[in-house]
């Protein structure tokens, strides 16, 4: 029985047995299906030809070859093996328990048959469910030839395979299921009813040549013996019938006179396969027969009907047609023979199917998990069988010449005997899982993915060398009977084996793919068995009486056991021990203290003797390569040292038992070392490819990210909101992962190399997956495997008291958050201040339990109350800085070059503050922990009480590290000297350690006071740093707003929970009268409309006069329309009851966001041709015409005329619009008021539009319908008299010499800036404003060139002012220019030119100017105060609330507003509000359109009034020339550094330093000069941290 696993069934013996036996007998087991064949079946498989008699065979299963087996047929191969190609269909006749199956294949071209044995793992079942389905009992009924049935149903119930009795052994063509069934069908049709004899009427006679196998004739433990009988058909031919013995509930009763037919299925349960598996199955079957798919109705769980597609040949269903290559068109012999098509593809059962219960359409990951679980179960069963084998049956590896072949070729070469190295069910399930599940690979320990220690082991060869080194060293220590060092190195051996097993576990997919799992399991069993024996026997030996007696009587010859507490150790050759420094650190030192002796004995155990290891031992260990011989094992053992035992009598019983144990340990070491080398030989020769990198065994940080535990890093490359991810605000589903940090789409994605590693370990390709889809797929796909991403458990855990984790709240970076922090910091100061703190007063009391309890309770209460401070630091919303970083890395196409330069400059200044923030956050974590520990220590009399609980080994001692004997440092000439210096330094440090020497006893009270002081200071400093972050945020937003870069503002604020402009949110109440008063014109008559609407409701109008879509409108609390459907809005626009002027203006301005132009005109025409309701009397009809139809017609005409007159632009033109000319002619014929004007406008705007010149935007006023044109002639109160203007002489003087800026009067300069700005402002049109809000979402509005010019002029003015100052080398000139521009800005404010005023103020507060301390020192205090007031006016806090209040007071005068406010209003109103209300798709959010229309109207309203200022060409020329070729802010900053270099103690100017800035400098300087050292080095400006790059 020793070679039962290396044999196959002997078919020749089976034939002889079959010919000798004529007695029918049947024996079966409960779990094995037996088949019966006649003698002619064996004859059909012989090589001798005979007449072509048909033989009917019923297979017990059908599989498709997954790999080539025994192909091509070799001369020396066994004739009993079946030769198949990948994709061929194999009909199974018998399944042996050894894993070998008896099967046959049929040649499509000639119908010849080849039969033989093949391993079960080379076959892939067509479907797992169809064999069970076809084994159900059939209902008897007769059917005609047109009966629709499944071919597999016929096969599985009544049809047999009719094969010729003289098959050829020649090579066949490809075989498919459809071809074989077609042959069977044709054979059945030609032979009639008597061709098949039912199982019930068939006697059993001659045995099957390959199925009837007895234990005497085969080495297989077969569970079934078969007997067959011969039956003659009507034509005298011999026929063989084979059938499986069914279970009790699966019988097939059919007589020979009945035809086979399909079951009557009214509701068939099916299983739909995914598209990937369908394509995999079909592409794996090569055939020249076209595959046919039939649509089948399907009943879903919701009783809905839909179509699925059914393949009759393969008996599979799918939800959509697969895309596969056309093998017929791609065939090479297409010209030789015509393509074949299935002859019976119409015979398909078209009854409705139903999905299997609890089996929806499964994805590949689900089936992969199922197959893996089945595989694991089968592997456990095989392990149980293997455990019954004797230990003497050692494993061996046949080192063939072809060991580099792949898996399938190894089977072909080695034969069936090699199949038993892996269990057959395990291999079968492995193949199925590889077909369905995606391939996975472990995350390797690569330096470009992880941060490794310098001595981390990253290669399998390194781990092998370390294991062998520890093994030989432990063996040597045992031979020298050094118990301490033997225990140490034996523990290290165990650790290395654990890590080896963990590495194999992580590479289980690669090992299974190479079919080496069972062999590796056996090796690990041997390793663990040897370790167990060594551990037990070594303890028995060292604890034996013989060993103790020997140690007592041993002389001092053995130097290894005499070295105690020495500073250096020597080996047998006198060399210093290789790992002496490591041993000194890892082994605890003995310590004695003078005062506290209560824990002296338990503090640290005394150091015992050290054994020496020759450093050359490691060099003698050769790395085992793939070609190294396994038997070349080198061990440090030569023989048992007889001198060790010669002094003891051999007759001593203790001597004999000890020697026996000694020898057993010695032998087990040799076995263990042999198993180690055997394991790595198998791994390197079969599993590893070119790279032998280890999987990542130890916890190490990913490169490019650091975030975990209580530390949150929002700049991490893969932070998630609820889960720590970064996406664009998408919901998390079961098939995709979102990765959004606080709904922030701007956070960086996972690094590519890290994403590739995670995706590969999860079985997905990172190239085809987006980074936001990796995490969930990874965790979903790997939930059933060993590797689970992010260390999540691979099984479901249930905790009875588990709390549902709530999403942490993000604290906005605002003043409110800062005030909360300051409040908590003040509480900390009151309680723990060193001078007046309540808690510190307790510490001065005498030591007692009451005093200690009060200290602990007060401290815990204080920490519990102030934990909010730590939570704010961890969850502070830094989205604006994250967006800033991402905009620098991936600039948006919407940003210009100037904005990109500003972002880089801003990041360089912000990064230092952010670095200080993270430093203070870490310091706060540390001080909280220290405060808790010092509070607890106040209750201890001995502060070293718990030191005995400290581990004897440092952190990471058990982790595998490279042995330093292999490093160049050890092998260098200075190693000995460095080793001695290191040992000396180590002992010096130990001698100075207070814990061991008690130089100074720790005072718990003083330590607690110091911790409280640091706690107070750090909490205060945290508030200062957050205040600086808020200031930096405001500076960013101020710049973006003042430079009118609304796109930059939107990008910076993306993802913030606290919206900067709250009033633009839909949640902002429409009832806010303060907001609406500024944007609603009273002339539009909203109040009159509400009153008239209420009056109409009270009148009880007849039903046919009411509005049809009134119920589809949504009103707010003030009666204004908030939303409605398109029909309701058009009806209200042309209402017959009253005119809503405000609504009409909004509708005509924003209609393009609701309807297309053609839809708008057609909706009005449809409204004009309104039909009367049914059932009206003659009088009611006349009333309807008079009071509803005619008013509506008039409203339609007026709306069209107004629209074409005031709100039309060429960009609204669409094909088909000129057709409304016919409508206008009809209106004229009906004599509707205003019809002729409408006809004229249509001819002008629509018909002759292309022939007319474009209208000058400067002369166009988009709100002329509401505003009287006479207002334009009104004189502005702000004007300049002729006396105030420069005289003609002055003008001549300016022309005679070159003008200098300081020569121009500031007021004159301000007036000319106002003239220039106002001229540009008048060119802005309504449609350009809409273009800024909508872009091209609804239509191409033609761009906004005039707005672009206006913004560019203002920004250039800003750069000009700052550049003019910074380019001056003389500090006095810079100060004069600064005061000059402050005066110009003030005059601009007086002229209501807020645009130029803001540009100048922004320039003076820019970083190149703001940092010029020497310049600002020379500026007068009056100018500084004036500039400060102007800056406060344009403060962006609360959405420019101060500026808005001032602008609201500017009425009926000329004005140039600051356009950045309007751009922000348009942008955030459009983005911050939905297009539809109530999450619907038809109720349009009209309030959003109203807000946009009000903003546009306010912009246009400032064009009504004009300045009465004279344009001075000379000064205009100077201004225009100065605004050309001005450098950007980055260049100006370089000039600023040249004129005033950066000083070490200067952080900014003093004229505008806030109180918080002063406090910051004060605290930073204090902490820099901390008495105990540099506690926090926050005073100096740090370079930009890599964290933000």
UniProtKB/Swiss-Prot annotation:
InterPro entries: Ras-like_GEF, Ras-like_Gua-exchang_fac_N, Ras_G-nucl-exch_fac_CS, Ras_GEF_dom_sf, RASGEF_cat_dom, RASGEF_cat_dom_sf, SH3-like_dom_sf, SH3_domain. Residues 1-14, 173-205, 211-238, 415-424, 1260-1269 have a biased composition (Polar residues). Residues 58-128 form the SH3 domain. The modification Phosphoserine is found at residues 151, 154, 423, 580, 596, 632, 649. It is a single-pass membrane protein. GO terms for molecular function: guanyl-nucleotide exchange factor activity. Residues 359-375, 1249-1259 have a biased composition (Basic and acidic residues). SMART domains: RasGEF, RasGEFN, SH3. Gene3D superfamilies: Ras guanine-nucleotide exchange factors catalytic domain (1.10.840.10), SH3 Domains (2.30.30.40), Son of sevenless (SoS) protein Chain: S domain 1 (1.20.870.10). Promotes the exchange of Ras-bound GDP by GTP. This protein positively controls the level of cellular cAMP at start, the stage at which the yeast cell division cycle is triggered. This is Cell division control protein 25. The lineage of its organism: Eukaryota, Fungi, Dikarya, Ascomycota, Saccharomycotina.
């Amino acid at each position: 029985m020793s070679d039962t696993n290396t044999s196959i069934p002997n078919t020749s013996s089976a034939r002889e047995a079959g010919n000798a036996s004529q007695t029918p007998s049947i024996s079966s087991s409960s779990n094995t299906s037996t088949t019966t064949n006649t003698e002619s079946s064996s004859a059909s498989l012989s090589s001798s030809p005979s007449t072509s008699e048909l033989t009917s065979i019923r297979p017990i299963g059908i599989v498709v070859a997954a790999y080539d087996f025994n192909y091509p047929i070799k001369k020396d191969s066994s004739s009993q093996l079946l030769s198949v190609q990948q994709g061929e269909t194999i009909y199974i006749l018998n399944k042996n328990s050894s894993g070998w199956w008896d099967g046959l294949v049929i040649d499509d071209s000639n119908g010849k048959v080849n039969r033989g044995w093949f391993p079960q793992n080379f076959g892939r079942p067509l479907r797992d469910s169809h064999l069970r389905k076809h084994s159900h009992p059939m209902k008897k009924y007769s059917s005609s030839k047109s009966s629709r049935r499944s071919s597999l149903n016929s096969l599985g119930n009544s049809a047999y395979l009719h094969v010729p009795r003289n098959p050829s052994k020649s090579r066949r063509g490809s075989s498919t299921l459809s071809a074989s069934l077609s042959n069977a069908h044709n054979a059945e049709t030609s032979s009639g009813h008597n061709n098949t004899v039912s199982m019930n009427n068939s006697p059993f006679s001659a045995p099957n040549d390959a199925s009837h196998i007895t234990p005497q004739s085969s080495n297989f433990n077969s569970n079934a013996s078969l007997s067959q009988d011969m039956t003659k058909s009507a034509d005298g031919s011999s026929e063989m019938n084979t059938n499986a013995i069914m279970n009790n509930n699966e019988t097939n009763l059919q007589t020979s006179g009945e035809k086979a037919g399909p079951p009557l299925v009214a509701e068939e349960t099916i299983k739909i396969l995914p598209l990937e598996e369908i394509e995999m199955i079909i592409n794996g079957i090569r055939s020249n027969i076209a595959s046919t798919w039939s649509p089948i109705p399907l009943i879903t769980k919701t009783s809905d009907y839909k179509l699925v597609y059914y393949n009759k040949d393969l008996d599979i269903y799918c939800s959509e047609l697969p895309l596969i290559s056309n093998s017929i068109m791609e065939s090479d012999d297409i010209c030789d023979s015509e393509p074949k098509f299935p002859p019976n593809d119409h015979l398909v059962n078209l009854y409705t199917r139903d999905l299997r219960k609890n089996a929806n359409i499964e994805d590949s990951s689900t089936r992969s998990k199922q197959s893996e679980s089945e595989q694991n179960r089968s592997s456990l069963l095989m392990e149980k069988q293997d455990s019954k084998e004797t230990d003497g049956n050692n494993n061996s590896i046949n080192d063939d010449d072809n060991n580099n072949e792949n898996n399938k070729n190894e089977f072909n070469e080695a034969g069936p005997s090699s199949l038993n190295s892996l269990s057959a069910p395990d291999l079968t399930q492995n193949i199925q899982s590889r077909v369905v599940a995606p391939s996975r690979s472990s995350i390797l320990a690569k330096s470009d993915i992880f941060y490794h220690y310098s001595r981390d082991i990253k290669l399998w060869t390194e781990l092998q060398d370390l294991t062998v080194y520890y093994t030989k060293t432990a063996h040597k220590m045992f031979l020298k009977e050094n118990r301490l060092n033997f225990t140490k190195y034996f523990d290290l051996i165990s650790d290395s084996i654990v890590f080896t097993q963990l590495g194999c576990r992580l590479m289980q997919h690669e090992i299974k793919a190479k079919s080496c799992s069972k062999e590796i399991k056996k090796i690990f069993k041997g390793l663990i068995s040897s370790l167990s024996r060594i551990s037990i026997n070594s303890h028995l030996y060292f604890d034996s009486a013989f060993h103790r007696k020997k140690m007592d009587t041993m002389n001092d010859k053995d130097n290894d056991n005499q070295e105690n507490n020495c500073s250096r150790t020597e080996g047998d050759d006198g060399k210093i021990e290789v790992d002496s420094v490591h041993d000194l650190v890892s082994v605890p030192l003995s310590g004695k203290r003078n005062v506290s002796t209560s824990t002296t004995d338990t503090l640290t155990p005394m150091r015992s003797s050290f054994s020496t290891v020759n450093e050359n031992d490691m060099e003698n260990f050769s790395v085992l390569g793939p070609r190294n011989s396994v038997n070349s094992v080198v061990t440090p053992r030569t023989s048992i040292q007889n001198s060790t035992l010669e002094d003891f009598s051999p007759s001593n019983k203790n001597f004999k038992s000890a020697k026996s144990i000694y020898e057993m340990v010695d032998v087990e070491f040799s076995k263990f070392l042999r198993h180690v080398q055997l394991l790595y030989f198998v791994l390197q020769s079969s599993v590893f490819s070119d790279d032998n990198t280890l999987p990542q065994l130890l916890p190490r940080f990913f490169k490019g990210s650091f975030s975990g535990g209580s530390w949150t890093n929002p700049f991490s490359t893969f932070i998630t909101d609820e889960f720590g991810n970064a996406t664009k605000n998408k919901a998390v589903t079961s098939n995709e992962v979102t990765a959004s940090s606080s709904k922030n789409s701007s956070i960086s994605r996972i690094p590519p190399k890290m994403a590739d590693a995670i995706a590969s370990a999860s079985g997905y390709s990172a190239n085809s997956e987006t980074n936001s889809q990796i995490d969930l797929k990874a965790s979903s796909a790997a939930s059933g495997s060993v590797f689970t991403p992010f260390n999540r458990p691979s099984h479901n855990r249930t905790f009875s008291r588990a709390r549902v984790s709530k999403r942490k709240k993000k604290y906005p970076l605002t003043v409110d958050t800062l005030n909360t922090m300051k409040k908590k910091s003040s509480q900390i100061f009151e309680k723990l201040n060193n001078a007046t703190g309540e808690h510190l007063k307790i510490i001065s009391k005498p030591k007692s339990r009451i005093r200690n309890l009060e200290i602990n309770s007060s401290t815990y209460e204080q920490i519990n109350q102030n934990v909010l401070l730590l939570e704010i630091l961890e969850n502070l919303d830094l989205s604006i800085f994250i967006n800033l970083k991402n905009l620098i890395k991936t600039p948006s196409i919407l940003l210009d070059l100037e904005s990109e330069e500003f972002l880089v400059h801003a990041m360089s200044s912000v990064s230092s503050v952010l670095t200080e923030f993270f430093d203070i956050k870490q310091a706060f974590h540390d001080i909280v922990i220290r405060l808790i520990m010092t509070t607890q220590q106040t209750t201890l009399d001995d502060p070293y009480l718990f030191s005995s609980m400290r581990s004897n080994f440092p952190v990471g001692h058990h982790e595998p590290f490279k042995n330093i004997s292999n490093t160049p440092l050890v092998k260098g000439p200075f190693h000995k000297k460095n080793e001695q210096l290191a040992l000396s330094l180590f002992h010096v440090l130990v001698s100075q350690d207070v814990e061991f020497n008690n130089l100074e006893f720790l005072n718990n009270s003083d330590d607690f006071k110091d911790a409280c002081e640091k706690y107070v200071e750090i909490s205060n400093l945290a508030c200062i740093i957050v205040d600086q972050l808020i200031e930096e945020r405001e500076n960013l937003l101020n710049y973006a707003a003042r430079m009118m870069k609304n796109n930059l503002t939107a990008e910076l604020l993306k993802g913030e929970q606290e919206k900067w402009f709250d009033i633009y949110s839909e949640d902002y109440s429409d009832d806010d009268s303060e907001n609406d008063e500024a944007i609603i014109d009273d002339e539009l008559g909203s109040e009159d409309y509400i009153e008239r609407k209420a009056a109409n409701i009270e009148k009880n109008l007849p039903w046919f006069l009411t509005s049809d879509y009134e119920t589809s409108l949504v009103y707010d609390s003030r009666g204004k329309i908030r939303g409605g459907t398109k029909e309701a809005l058009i009806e209200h626009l042309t209402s017959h009851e009253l005119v809503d002027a405000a609504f009409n203006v909004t509708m005509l301005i924003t209609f393009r966001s609701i309807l297309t132009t053609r839809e708008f005109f057609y909706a009005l025409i449809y409204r004009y041709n309104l039909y009367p309701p049914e059932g009206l009397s003659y009088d009611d009809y006349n009333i309807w015409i008079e009071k509803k139809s005619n008013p509506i017609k008039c409203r339609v005409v007026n709306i069209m005329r107004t629209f074409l007159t005031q709100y039309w632009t060429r960009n609204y033109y669409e094909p088909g619009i000129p057709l409304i000319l016919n409508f206008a002619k009809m209106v004229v014929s009906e004599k509707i008021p205003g019809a002729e004007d409408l006809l004229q406008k249509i001819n002008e705007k629509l018909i002759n539009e292309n022939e007319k010149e474009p209208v000058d935007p400067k002369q166009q006023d988009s709100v002329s319908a509401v505003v009287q044109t006479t207002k334009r002639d009104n004189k502005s109160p702000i004007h300049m008299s002729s006396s105030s203007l420069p005289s003609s002489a002055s003008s001549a003087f300016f022309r005679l010499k070159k003008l200098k800026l300081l020569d121009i009067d500031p007021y004159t300069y301000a007036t000319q800036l106002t003239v220039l700005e106002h001229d540009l402002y008048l060119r802005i049109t309504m449609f350009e404003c809409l273009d800024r809000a909508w872009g091209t979402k609804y239509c191409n509005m033609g761009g906004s060139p005039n707005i672009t010019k206006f913004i560019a002029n203002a920004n250039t003015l800003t750069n000009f002012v700052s550049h003019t100052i910074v380019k001056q080398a003389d500090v006095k000139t810079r100060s004069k220019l600064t005061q000059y521009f402050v005066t110009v800005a003030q005059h601009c404010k007086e002229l209501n030119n807020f645009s130029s005023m803001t540009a100048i103020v922004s320039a003076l507060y820019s970083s190149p100017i703001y940092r010029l301390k020497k310049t600002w020192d020379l500026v007068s205090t009056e100018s500084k105060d004036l500039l400060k007031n102007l800056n406060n006016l344009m403060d962006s806090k609360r959405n420019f609330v101060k500026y808005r209040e001032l602008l609201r007071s500017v009425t009926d005068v000329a004005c140039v507003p600051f356009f950045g406010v309007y751009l922000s209003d348009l942008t955030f109103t459009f983005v911050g509000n939905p297009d539809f209300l109530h999450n619907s798709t038809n109720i349009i959010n009209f309030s959003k359109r109203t807000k946009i229309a009000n903003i546009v109207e306010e912009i246009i309203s400032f064009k009504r009034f004009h300045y009465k200022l004279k344009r001075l060409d000379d000064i205009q020329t100077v201004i225009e020339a100065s605004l050309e070729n001005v450098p950007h802010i980055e260049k100006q900053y370089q000039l600023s550094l040249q004129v005033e270099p950066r000083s070490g103690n200067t952080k900014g100017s003093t004229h505008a330093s806030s109180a918080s800035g002063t406090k910051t400098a004060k605290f930073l300087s204090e902490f820099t000069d901390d008495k105990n050292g540099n506690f926090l080095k926050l005073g100096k400006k740090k370079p930009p941290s890599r964290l933000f790059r």
